[in-house]
């Protein structure tokens, strides 16, 4: 079974998959399925693409990097040895205490030796250098551990101890003590050297979280501990991916510094020397890894930047600044709005979201738009235009071209709605399924007048009367005149005009007159309701 999980996931959320029986094939599958750690995936994919593009320079840089590591590890030393020498100091302290409290009793000496052996073996396993780990993993050489050495020493000392009396045995033990002390010192020196040369120690420490020691009571350690607790409480997926890089400075060494200074130079040389085919390979790799967690995290960080967010909205999704909505001016015949003192809050029903049909009825009731004089059809004369009770309703229809399908009323989420009121982006119902106006209003024109299509690009820019190659959007204007009937004398000025159930009816498609082709509009059935808000 393969255990694949992220650093930020708890133990109970680890994913298990069945192994194929081959370690190399399992690693390849984990990298391709993005279940391995992110640096394994990125380094493997990047190294594979470089091998395909430039095998010689890639192999040369790889060999140079490995030679740098294995040749400079003998001379490089850590900057801070306090954390790295804790294990060796603990071993030396335990060895001194065991020497001082040693007795000729075999039981007590065996217990101390067992404790010391376990400690040294654990430290040797944790502080094993990277080259020795590779040897042990692939070739698995036979290495002499401290346990076998102790057994050999006991076997060599047992004949001399058995044939002598107690004082002689004590003397023999005293004689062997210096050799044991020298062996302990030698092991401590080897542990120090292994700790300095340990690549696995660097890699494993980068993958772990920094643990603040509770021994010291200084303010710096307390503040660091509180900071780590705050980070743990707000630990996100992006923090898990960037965790090795965030904690890199805490394990800074000359080897890391030189390597990460040497690596960008080589990478910059390779990047500037890449031809067009390499650029195509890089773009294809980005396309293949688009849904991978690391790339999504990088894109999420880029979109949070205001400059890139502005470019993304302007050139990718075509989001522009919405025009200012015109302030509706109340008609002279309409009653004034009630003041704040006389206005009583309605307790009958909560506020409901306006539907497109309800919004259209309100637009008809208080439309500030008057018929323009440049319209040739259905225009008003000077005598008629002077009548303040006559107004004109303008609606804008938007459509988008879909490759292989044609022009459809379905638009993108960033596009304007299918039908909007002129000068705003509020959605309204389709004109072919419009209701009769509410009480107090009446249509002047029997049919809707439709202007020709205006073609624009995918960002609703560059308008043109004829369709061009990159015209993926179009819009046209629907207009119809209506008259506002003066209120009756016996009617209260604030009579509700929203009850339109008695005057609801659908108009047929033959009421529409166009100057060009009219797209087939869907006639929506209007259910019976007590008001326009139920639409």
UniProtKB/Swiss-Prot annotation:
The keyword Transmembrane helix applies. Residues 97-111, 180-194 have a biased composition (Basic and acidic residues). SMART domains: DysFC, DysFN. GO terms for cellular component: cytoplasm; peroxisomal membrane. GO terms for biological process: peroxisome organization. Pfam families: Pex24p. Glycans are attached at residues 374, 377, 409, 418. It is found in: Peroxisome membrane. It is a multi-pass membrane protein. The chain crosses the membrane at residues 32-52, 263-283. Residues 142-160, 496-522 have a biased composition (Polar residues). Keywords: Glycoprotein, Membrane, Peroxisome, Transmembrane, Transmembrane helix. Residues 339-349 have a biased composition (Low complexity). InterPro entries: Peroxin/Ferlin (IPR006614), Peroxisomal_PEX28-32 (IPR052646), TECPR1-like_DysF (IPR010482). The keyword Transmembrane applies. Residues 87-115, 142-194, 323-353, 482-535 are annotated as: Disordered. Belongs to the PEX28-32 family. PEX32 subfamily. This is Peroxisomal membrane protein pex32. The gene is pex32.
């Amino acid at each position: 079974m393969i255990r694949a999980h992220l650093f930020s996931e708890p133990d109970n959320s680890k994913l298990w998959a069945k192994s194929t029986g081959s370690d190399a094939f399992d690693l390849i599958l984990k990298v391709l399925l993005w279940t391995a750690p992110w640096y394994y995936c990125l380094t493997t994919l990047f190294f594979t693409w470089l091998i395909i593009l430039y095998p010689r320079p890639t192999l040369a840089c790889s060999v140079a990097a490995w030679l740098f590591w294995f040749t400079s590890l003998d001379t490089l030393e850590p900057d801070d040895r306090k954390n790295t020498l804790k294990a060796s100091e603990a071993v030396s302290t335990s060895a001194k205490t065991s020497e001082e409290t040693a007795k000729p009793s075999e039981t007590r000496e065996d217990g101390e030796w067992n404790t010391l052996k376990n400690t040294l073996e654990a430290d040797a396993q944790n502080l094993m250098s990277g080259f020795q780990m590779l040897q042990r993993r692939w070739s698995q050489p036979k290495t002499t551990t401290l346990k076998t050495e102790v057994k050999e020493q006991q076997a060599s000392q047992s004949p001399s101890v058995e044939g002598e009396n107690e004082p002689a045995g004590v003397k023999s033990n005293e004689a062997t003590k210096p050799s044991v002390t020298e062996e302990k010192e030698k092991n401590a020196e080897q542990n120090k050297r292994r700790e300095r040369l340990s690549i696995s120690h660097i890699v494993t420490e980068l993958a772990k979280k920094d643990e603040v020691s509770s021994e010291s009571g200084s303010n710096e350690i307390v503040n660091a501990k509180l900071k780590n607790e705050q980070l743990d409480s707000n630990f996100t997926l992006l923090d898990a991916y960037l965790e090795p890089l965030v904690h890199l400075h805490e394990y800074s060494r000359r080897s890391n510094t030189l390597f990460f200074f040497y690596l960008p130079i080589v990478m910059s040389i390779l990047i500037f020397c890449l031809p067009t085919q390499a650029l195509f390979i890089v773009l294809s790799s980005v396309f293949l890894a688009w849904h991978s967690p690391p790339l999504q995290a990088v894109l999420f960080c880029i979109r949070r930047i205001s400059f890139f967010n502005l470019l993304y909205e302007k050139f990718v999704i075509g989001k522009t600044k919405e025009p200012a909505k015109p302030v509706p001016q109340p008609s002279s015949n309409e009653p004034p709005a009630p003041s704040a003192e006389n206005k009583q809050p309605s307790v009958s029903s909560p506020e409901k979201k306006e539907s497109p049909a309800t919004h259209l009825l309100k637009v008809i009731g208080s439309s500030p738009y008057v018929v323009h004089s440049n319209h040739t059809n259905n225009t008003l004369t000077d005598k008629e235009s002077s009548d303040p009770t006559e107004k004109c309703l303008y609606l804008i229809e938007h459509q988008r071209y879909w490759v292989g399908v044609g022009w459809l009323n379905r638009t993108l989420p960033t596009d304007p709605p299918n039908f909007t009121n002129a000068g705003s982006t509020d959605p309204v119902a389709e004109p072919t399924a419009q209701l009769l106006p509410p009480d107090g209003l009446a249509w002047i024109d029997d049919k809707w007048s439709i202007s020709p299509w205006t073609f624009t690009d995918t960002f609703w820019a560059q308008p043109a009367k004829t369709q061009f190659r990159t015209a993926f959007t179009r819009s046209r204007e629907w207009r119809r005149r209506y008259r506002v009937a003066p209120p009756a004398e016996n009617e209260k000025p604030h009579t509700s005009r929203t009850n339109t159930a008695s005057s609801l009816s659908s108009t047929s498609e033959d009421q529409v007159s166009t100057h060009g082709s009219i797209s087939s509009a869907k006639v929506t059935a209007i259910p019976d309701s007590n008001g326009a808000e139920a639409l």
